[in-house]
Amino acid sequence: MLPRLGCVLFCSLVVLLLSCLLLLKERIPAGSSKAHQQFLALPRSHHSQCSPNLTVVNTSLSLPSRHRLFLTYRHCRNFSILLEPSECARDTFLLLVIKSQPAHIEQRSAIRSTWGRAGSWARGRQLKLVFLLGVAGPVPPAQLLVYESWQFDDILQWDFAEDFFNLTLKELHVQRWIAAACTQAHFILKGDDDVFIHVPNVLEFLEGWDPAQDFLVGDVIRLARPNRNTKVKYFIPFSMYRARHYPPYAGGGGYVMSQATVRHLHMAMEEAELFPIDDVFVGMCLRKLGVTPIHHAGFKTFGIQQPLNPRDPCLYKGLLLVHRLSPLEMWTMWALVTDERLKCAATHKP
């Protein structure tokens, strides 16, 4: 089954790319939307309208270059929308916001073709899927993203560079977009583009929650310590965070929260100083709000660990979200989980 699914996925991707390149000009005429025209002419200078903080530059020379760059431009927190999907419908029950990158065409295609086909799983509930992107060089071409946005109406892109430390900017900017275009959504699930979401299980879980009440549920990490090793991606110097432990936070691979929490988080984020690790930044804002994240074993943001079998479809039937799947693994697991012939001896409820 794996070779066959791999071939199908590869062929689908090739067809998508060729279609985009061949049909772009005739599908998006010269008189297309102003937003698309502005995007095509946009310069690739991500800090052109925000001057560097030279005081910080002089006091952070001992830090790694990525940290110096973050501190130099941390005050820059207002970036333009380049591509934007339509607003949420009035009866949107669940908004799925997925962090992606421009080059991750294969991941987005796999999601749209599997669990992202929300309508087939919604059971009368209105769902909306949105991918969150920054800007990442000339590949793929800007025109290709314009076509993808036009074709699927699920791309939300801002004019800041794709970078691990800029994931916090995605958090802040998507909160603003939700406040402007998707206030009707009862619940919001955030995830990465390498997660498998069991939509029916998520919908069943949310039936018992009130969107007007504060809550955030996921794979909660407690008593995590800042990493002081300058050679690792998660390094945080004392000058940026002095406490011994981070506040409780949900793993950024995926978590779900209420409409009320999103609204309150937006206000807290606007007042908070940006922090380079997005998961922890959300945890800091939750602590400021007095909201404690709730742990749920159905969120596997570190994947399925041994001795459990990460390829057991019966295990997936009892989970809400599993992190770190390749597009091929996502296709495979979706095909198995949705196969009516699949018989499980017992449901693996978390």
UniProtKB/Swiss-Prot annotation:
EC class name: transferase
Endpoints of the signal sequence: none
GO molecular function: N-acetyllactosaminide beta-1,3-N-acetylglucosaminyltransferase activity
InterPro entries tied to this protein: Glyco_trans_31
GO cellular component annotations of the record: Golgi membrane
Keyword Kinase: no
TM regions (residue ranges): 5-25
Pathway entry: Protein modification; protein glycosylation
Residues bearing glycans: 53, 166
Sequence similarity: Belongs to the glycosyltransferase 31 family.
Function noted in UniProt: Beta-1,3-N-acetylglucosaminyltransferase involved in the synthesis of poly-N-acetyllactosamine. Has activity for type 2 oligosaccharides.
UniProt protein name: N-acetyllactosaminide beta-1,3-N-acetylglucosaminyltransferase 4
Species: Mus musculus (Mouse)
